[in-house]
Amino acid sequence: MKLLMLMRKFLTGLLLCGAIVSAYGDVWDEVSHGYADNNGVKIHYATTGTGPLVIMIHGFPDFWYSWRHQMEGLSENFQVVAMDQRGYNLSDQPEGKESYNMEYLVSDVAALIRHFGSDKATIVGHDWGGIVSWQFAFARPEMVENLVILNLPHPNGLARELASNSDQQENSAYARRFIAGSATDPDILFGGPMNSQSLSFWVSDPKAREKYVKAFDNSSFDAMLAYYKQNYPRVSEGNTPPPAPQLDVPLLVFHGLRDTALHSNGLNNTWDWNDSDTTIVSAPDANHFVQQDAADLVTTTLKWWLLSRQ
């Protein structure tokens, strides 16, 4: 049976439940760091906890630390591994935009799972991490225990909205600039330059922002844009890609409804494209970075949802 919508009122009750703690700390000094090798490309990760493997994949502009609240909340029951995607922070930054083709991003996740001696894991992705997570589930379904997506509609839904929804088309103007432009263009990032400070504009916590600035100092801006140049959907009215493969995996989707990049209409029909149970959770007051804007809601719901499947 498909669960189409988990009501926020019910989730708020979970947050108040004494069985699950609703406030989570910072794991910066608690995690262990390491590298997985993918055909000579080193993929950095931070990990904490013990138990079934959970892989967390960040988006743009971000790094492993985006998942700090969820890592703390899940670590009692799961081994949580948050990766730096290639091009970001401490992971390798291979030359050439072709090095960021989706097949390589997907293979990085597979290499990370194998690095931990596992043949499958729960895959959690936000933004570009969400795109990679969807594609990983299509390409390597046997390696996906559960799939969790944050603020990135199913590719079928995103393609539909890009082709027909003027709001989504307007929201995606930045992506078209990234595809056509260069990291050195003076107006590439929402009318201004791309640098470590400007990329951290969305981080409200001053201490966290310091960490983001340092991580972006270590990152490749050309690599960040290569994700868009190589993989962003080229969709127009009457010209949409073929439907994505049908999924059959437990699926949990979060969406911050104040997202100005990805329209929530893209969530419609998600349940039609998955033959297993599908749960969609909206966070009305959260922006694009829902894992931070609604940290307690996301962490507590994710923990409950995963534990219910053990």
Predicted features along the sequence, with ranges:
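Bacterial N-terminal signal peptides that target proteins for export
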Residues: 2-11
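Bacterial N-terminal signal peptides
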Residues: 11-19
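Sec/Tat signal peptide C-region and signal peptidase I cleavage site
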Residues: 21-25
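Flexible "cap/lid" subdomain of the alpha/beta-hydrolase fold that forms the substrate-access gate
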Residues: 26-31, 41-43, 53, 67, ...
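Conserved HGGG/HGGXW glycine-rich cap/lid loop of the alpha/beta-hydrolase fold
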Residues: 47-90
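Catalytic histidine-centered segment of alpha/beta-hydrolase-like enzymes
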Residues: 286-295, 299
